[in-house]
Amino acid sequence: MSKLVVFLFCIQVCFIQNVYSQCLGRVGPGGPPLGPYGGPLGGPGYGPVGYGGCGGYGGSGIGNVAVAGELPVAGSTGVTGQVPVIGAVEFAGPACAVGSVSISGACGPTCGCGGSPFY
């Protein structure tokens, strides 16, 4: 086999791993049921069992979105269930709006305002 074919094959394998790691989350190289039952890595210095999760990149990050212009918005929105949102929204400039907003519930357990704080 030529070196180019081997190189392209390796690139394809990396692409496939990247795509499917988004769906599997933090599943380790041995799969979810096999992680706790594996042997220790590199001797007893790593504990009695192997590591359970060494999954691919989860796809989270920080980004900015800028929108300029007129934004005519009309209608109503109803959200029922759990909506995990952590972040901030900032408006700069005049924003003519009419309506009401009602937010009820509690934030996640990590912030400490809705549940017990997580340490």
Curated annotation (Swiss-Prot):
UniProt signal peptide: 1-21
GO cellular component, one term: egg chorion
The organism's place on the tree of life at top rank: Eukaryota
InterPro entries assigned: Chorion
Keyword presence, Signal: yes
Region spans: Central domain: 56-103
Keywords: Repeat, Signal
Keyword Chloroplast carried by entry: no
One Gene Ontology biological process: chorion-containing eggshell formation
Region span, Left arm: 22-55
A Pfam family matched in the record: Chorion_1
Region span, Right arm: 104-119
Gene Ontology MF term list: structural constituent of egg chorion
Transmembrane regions listed in the UniProt entry: none
Function: This protein is one of many from the eggshell of the silk moth.
Family: Belongs to the chorion protein family.
Name of protein: Chorion class CA protein ERA.2
UniProt source species: Bombyx mori
